[in-house]
Amino acid sequence: MLTKINKAIALVFVSLISFYQKWISPLFGPSCRFIPSCSAYGIEAVNKHGPWRGGWLTLKRLSKCHPFTPCGCDPVPEK
């Protein structure tokens, strides 16, 4: 169970990712190699696993999103 502090941190993370999706991502066009996109993955990971594990999973995912990695489906792991 998430504590109030963890819930607040998760809200900040999700808000930052949502800001990126709405205001920054449209400037560059679609570039993610995966389904779901890295930003959608980040929101789902934080909502499903909390801010710390979800944040870690998101960082791992972002590190794989480059031209030398095969593209495809990479869902958020279950708990």
UniProtKB/Swiss-Prot annotation:
Location of the protein in the cell: Cell inner membrane
Principal location: membrane
GO cellular component terms given for this protein: plasma membrane
Keywords for this protein: Cell inner membrane, Cell membrane, Membrane
Superkingdom of source: Bacteria
Bilayer topology: Peripheral membrane protein
Pfam families, per database record: YidD
Protein purpose: Could be involved in insertion of integral membrane proteins into the membrane.
Alphabetical list of PANTHER family matching this protein: MEMBRANE PROTEIN INSERTION EFFICIENCY FACTOR-RELATED (PTHR33383:SF1)
NCBIfam families the UniProt entry points to: membrane protein insertion efficiency factor YidD (TIGR00278)
HAMAP family, A to Z: UPF0161_YidD
Record family assignment: Belongs to the UPF0161 family.
Protein name, UniProt field: Putative membrane protein insertion efficiency factor
Organism of provenance: Prochlorococcus marinus (strain NATL1A)
